[in-house]
Amino acid sequence: MKELKHTKSEAMFKEAVKYIPGGVNSPVRAFGSVGLNPIFIDRAKGSKIYDVDGNEYIDYICSWGPLILGHSNEKLYEGIEETLRRGTSYGVPTEIEVKMAKLITEAYPSVDMVRMVNSGTEATMSALRVARGYTRRNKILKFEGCYHGHSDALLVKSGSGTITFGVPTSPGVPEGTVKDTLVCRYNDIEAVKRIFQEQGNEIAAVIVEPVSGNMGVVPGKQEFLQFLRDITKEYKSVLIFDEVITGFRLAYGGAQEVYGIEADMTCFGKIIGAGLPVGAYGGKREIMECVSPMGPVYQAGTLSGNPLAMHMGYKNLNILKENKDVYERLEEKAKRLEEGFNKNIKELGIKATVVRFKAMLCLFFAEGPLNNYDEVSKCDTEMYAKYFGEMLKRGVLIAPAQFEALFLSDAHTDEDIEYTIKANYEALKELKC
């Protein structure tokens, strides 16, 4: 095994902490939960990413999900220079925004209209406002471990970095802001039933990740998601599927296509921007017509629907639309990783569980079942930290936190998969020493 040097990354991090909180612009990038300093990236191509010290890694972060076709895909870049030369932002409408909206609504039968924003956080925040305006109710129901961005109302018992850093509800979020946020255990039908029996007529919306990708990977059970669909209809609440991660990743029609369940509203991000900042929320026409300027619910954004993000997103979605076998390839790769990891775990006698749903995958250092926040939060995070370091030494970059998903791209090769399984075996073997 070749020893990797990180001299330049260490120097850059030392400089970064002088000017940026924690040296990073998003907490998980600091590598703090795995006890290391971050590597700084120079470039990326295909399935590989290269740090400033010249080290090469097989990348399973993939910018946390947007890069389903891999890094620096040439097809995505076709025409981007011309788009750039025409102008980066206008503040008035463009044709590409209409094309992009039409493409999304065609992929999702539950979405009649869609509004572009700049991030997944904006998408979920705006969707809640619209749902409240539409129903004229205030309360919302979310689930422990589901992360819906960092807006105040949703930063309660969240997943992602809030588990990693042990801050389930962030300081700086006033109690008054979250007094109307109800929280239930994920995959727990009886708990949801009790809340609706007590407060159902006050609940504006239920927001859920159909497959949670921010407490590792925890799939919503079919019967659980169907129950949410049924009970929200009964009480005339809005069912919001947060598909920022799952949208256009599990299938071209996302989780709703896979489960066969249609939400009232859907939030998008990541893949619809192909690596550029973007988000969107959409839903039934009668709900979306509440949004300004058609209706009274205000939401706006200077850079929403900007030409560069729309160009990349439109290209990305069209490639996926015309090449839906991408999803079969992604699932096959994920399945091979799952089988390889499980074989290694069994052979070495490691207490770990691999959870896979379609092409979403996570290795938990805990024994299953893992169906909710309480079960997932018992993972051995110290063991994961050691595992991360051993994989990094072997040139495999995975999430620097136990509670994040492993992301595959169409650029990952058979050789990448085989090498990763081999590296996994060696890393797990080191943990036993």
Curated annotation (Swiss-Prot):
Domain of life of the native organism: Bacteria
EC number per UniProt: 5.4.3.8
Modified residues (N6-(pyridoxal phosphate)lysine): 270
Pathway(s) this gene product operates in, as recorded in its UniProt entry: Porphyrin-containing compound metabolism; protoporphyrin-IX biosynthesis; 5-aminolevulinate from L-glutamyl-tRNA(Glu): step 2/2
Subcellular localization, as worded in the UniProt entry: Cytoplasm
Cellular compartments per GO CC: cytoplasm
Keywords, alphabetical: Cytoplasm, Isomerase, Porphyrin biosynthesis, Pyridoxal phosphate
GO biological process, alphabetically ordered: protoporphyrinogen IX biosynthetic process
UniProt keyword annotation of Isomerase present: yes
Pfam families to which the protein is assigned, alphabetical: Aminotran_3
Cofactor field: pyridoxal 5'-phosphate
Chief location of this protein within or outside the cell: cytoplasm
GO function terms (MF aspect): glutamate-1-semialdehyde 2,1-aminomutase activity; pyridoxal phosphate binding; transaminase activity
Family: Belongs to the class-III pyridoxal-phosphate-dependent aminotransferase family. HemL subfamily.
PANTHER family: GLUTAMATE-1-SEMIALDEHYDE 2,1-AMINOMUTASE, GLUTAMATE-1-SEMIALDEHYDE 2,1-AMINOMUTASE 1, CHLOROPLASTIC-RELATED
NCBIfam families: hemL, PRK00062.1
Record's subunit section: Homodimer.
Annotated protein name in UniProt: Glutamate-1-semialdehyde 2,1-aminomutase
Gene name of this polypeptide: hemL
